[in-house]
């Protein structure tokens, strides 16, 4: 049978499976791909294809991740699944696979376990906006009351980490039954119910081009007779000639006006997300702008230097530190295009952080950076990456 051609018209959403080891994340991933390919077309993937996750590098860190695609009536999904707990930690902190929503897989037979809790906390810290729960292995629990108890436990745990535990969808089923072709309520029907929850509960993400204009400054030139040109790749939004913009970060915020946009030496009336452009600024001196700042829509982003974050510290094998670090450790924080020195405050109960650990920290930078919750950064020592992190909450 001929495969239908891939329709780019469907909105695209990124999701992933999270949860405790052996609760069935990979089996569920295979079941979703298999059941949906039967119903809506697309490629079915077996458990072995998914479990054998290829290595990839994100910010110099090796992560094993499997990528699976599937579609529903209304959407196209890209789904990530990681084999090991450490891969999840790295994946979520580096943002290698940004998730618009996550499917928390929890065994109905075991209930929430340590990694269930840790993945929920990580989701909160790195800004995963929506979680849907799949109570797996429901065929192994005969007692309806027990099933209800596990559901209550999971809801309470989610609420504890500020997710709407009472309101988010929970689907009960068996990924194994579904994968084996069982068409009953715990088999394929549960997978279709989960797909419906994905479609209805996770909103379509805003496209980059619809966001507020933001361009991280990579280089600054002065062109005689024309003024100052700032180059970089537009991260989100659109910039039109004649619009006011702000230069944010490192020093006091300045206002200026875009008098031209160039791409491949051609003049344009606008640039949009994804474009590598030169932006001509009116009345701005070359020394007023530097790498590490951003050009942004006025009022859309502010400079900050005090924040909490979640970091993963590279292990020795990954080229990281060989020794632990302690409170008040002062590395460089690499945001977008530049390094800023900052000091790290550890949680009260943490005396030191070992290579290979992940930990919540509070950071004080020496210079402010245009910052939002969810912004990724690298931690460096003398140009060498020793960790990766994400801004969890801005303090000031």
Swiss-Prot record:
Residues 10-206 form the tr-type G domain. Residues 81-84 are annotated as: G3. Its main location: cytoplasm. Transmembrane segments: none annotated. Its EC number is 3.6.5.3. GTP binds at residues 19-26, 81-85, 136-139. Residues 174-176 are annotated as: G5. It is an enzyme of class 3 (hydrolase). Residues 60-64 are annotated as: G2. It is found in: Cytoplasm. Mg(2+) binds at residue 26. One of its GO terms (cellular component) is cytosol. Pfam families: GTP_EFTU, GTP_EFTU_D2, GTP_EFTU_D3. The keyword Protein biosynthesis applies. Residues 19-26 are annotated as: G1. GTP hydrolase that promotes the GTP-dependent binding of aminoacyl-tRNA to the A-site of ribosomes during protein biosynthesis. Belongs to the TRAFAC class translation factor GTPase superfamily. Classic translation factor GTPase family. EF-Tu/EF-1A subfamily. This is Elongation factor Tu. The lineage of its organism: Bacteria, Pseudomonadati, Pseudomonadota, Betaproteobacteria, Burkholderiales. The gene is tuf1.
